[in-house]
Amino acid sequence: MGRIVGIDLGTTNSVVAVLEAGRPHVIANAEGGRTTPSVVGYSKDQELLVGQLARRQLVLSPRNTFSNLKRFVGRDWEELEDSSLAVPYTVRANDRGQVRVPCPVTEREYAPEELVASIIRKLVDDASTYLGESVEAAVVTVPAYFNDAQRQATRDAGRLAGIAVERILNEPTAAALAYGFDRSAVRRVLVFDLGGGTFDVSLLRIANGVFDVKATNGDTQLGGNDFDQRIVDWIADAFQAEHGVDLRRDRQALQRLTEAAEKAKQELSGVLTTPISLPFIATGENGPLHVETNLDRSTFEGLCPDLLDRLLMPVQSALRDSGWAADDIDDVVLVGGATRMPMVQQLVRTLVPLDPCQSVNPDEVVAIGAAVQAGILTGELRDLLLNDVTPLSLGLETVGGLMRVLIPRNTPIPVRQSDVFSTSEPNQSSVEIHVWQGERQMASDNKSLGRFRLSGIPPAPRGVPQVQVAFDIDANGLLQVSATDRTTGRKQSVSIQGGSNLNEDEVTALLAEAEARADEDRRKRNQIERRNRAQTLVAQAERRLRDAALELGPYGAERQQRAVEMAMRDVQDCLAQDDLQELDLCLSGLEEALFGLNRRLSAERQSDGRPLQGLRNTLGSLKDELFADDWDDDPWAAPSGPPRGRSLNRRDRDPWDDDFYR
């Protein structure tokens, strides 16, 4: 198996890591950062921007720049909460009730999976550049409480990015792998994962390389962004009360508010009060309006009591499902940047009387764990075993709309479970299998994953035919359902694919489009790299000319200097005219001219290291040109040089001087 990387696909930031020499480490992106903003955008020229480049245009072009995409992956429009829709760009439903994100500059609508695929593609490209080889597979992490639909959609995003998703891994489990993969002692670990847009808690038992997940719980619509939104609303409400202007109705103002709120939240983790300054954020009747205020930690915490309550309940549920008490926990691992908030850490301490582990970086630990899982898959790590669980119950709809659970939540995976059902009407020739996921008693209150029909059942009284329904969950947490008529042996099976906002034809079309776009992207990248190389070489040439003037004087290597200047002008002309075909030839000429100048400088340094030699050369050249007949003595001449009052003859010249052979 080839190289597999680990990807933490986050709501706010994403990270890629790899296992090398048995140790996992994070790969820096092309911009030098260890985390990549999970932001995708399009410039006014319709150029795709991902990561930091996209984040830079959030304020200037909020309708064409998309963040928090993870909250939309694998979800139908009717499932979205109002807090998820509080974004500066437009989110709407198509005629099938699926989420779509319009982009005005490209005049297209995108499924969330398409945009997320661009993030995955960048992470993989950066990893390929670092490793010096193509990366075609990855372990991708998802929140533990992601349902089957969201997991399928994440896998589709990987397909659109052109990689094979070898394993879908729960984020808290990945964090535990990173924390305990080199520990041999038996530990009971609580992983508290509060990211930008999702929250998970998992309880694991770690012993001698075996990781047993005992219980998991969470909230896929709760994260650090919700805390940011409380600050946004606090500022906007105060501004509206004072000036009568609702900043949330202006896309650019809303984006500025969001960035200021995130910054204030981060700063309040280390200080008790922080200033918030947003000049010229709006215009009133009397001129520009500004935001100038201070936010202290106690006020911030007073804005979020209900959010803390929502963090409390999943932890209590996970402890109850595992059968553990809080005192049974040996270690607490905090994951996600939002866990740096003091009020969150204090909440965890009230639940589990332990100081959280500080040996892991909460922003990177999930990607490191994904890299460990990649090492397990490739066989690089042979002494580790991971036993995960399914986060939500799986079942089907029975008579009266009831939910019949076949696989309860927190069942270890992979797993196969089956049960026998019958017909509800006499002479019924077919049955519909409707698969649901969730914890509610009524099927319609849960998440519908898909349905299919088993036909060809022989006529019989009600309750006589026997239909065996089997659920299979693989190690990725993905579901396959089959139904078999025991009388005829007729069988119907289906891999649940209803989670994605794209059908198979759309995925195929997008893959073809992505390949065509990849060729264009490579061409654009090549053009940019050639221009950057040219600009770098011109800057280098300018430095070498200054060095030559200082060391040799303006006439010490006149021919080489003129050659560099002419070649440099040719390159600058090509850049100005955007003539990239001629640029390569001009670059070769500049490199050749620089080689000649560098050789001349090197020879001069080797032959004479005396100080002020450049100044002596300059004054000597000026004297020869202007005062050769008037000066009898040259105060700057070297004692061992040729006779005063005349220039060097062929015998006296430096044999390394190219002018010698003219």
Curated annotation (Swiss-Prot):
GO terms for molecular function: ATP binding; ATP-dependent protein folding chaperone; unfolded protein binding. The modification Phosphothreonine is found at residue 198. SUPFAM superfamilies: Actin-like ATPase domain, Heat shock protein 70kD (HSP70), peptide-binding domain. The keyword Nuclease does not apply. The keyword Nucleus does not apply. Pfam families: HSP70 (PF00012). Induction: By stress conditions e.g. heat shock. Keywords: ATP-binding, Chaperone, Nucleotide-binding, Phosphoprotein, Stress response. Residues 649-662 have a biased composition (Basic and acidic residues). Residues 630-662 are annotated as: Disordered. Belongs to the heat shock protein 70 family. NCBIfam families: PRK00290.1 (NF001413), PRK13410.1 (NF009946), prok_dnaK (TIGR02350). Acts as a chaperone. This is Chaperone protein dnaK1. It comes from Parasynechococcus marenigrum (strain WH8102).
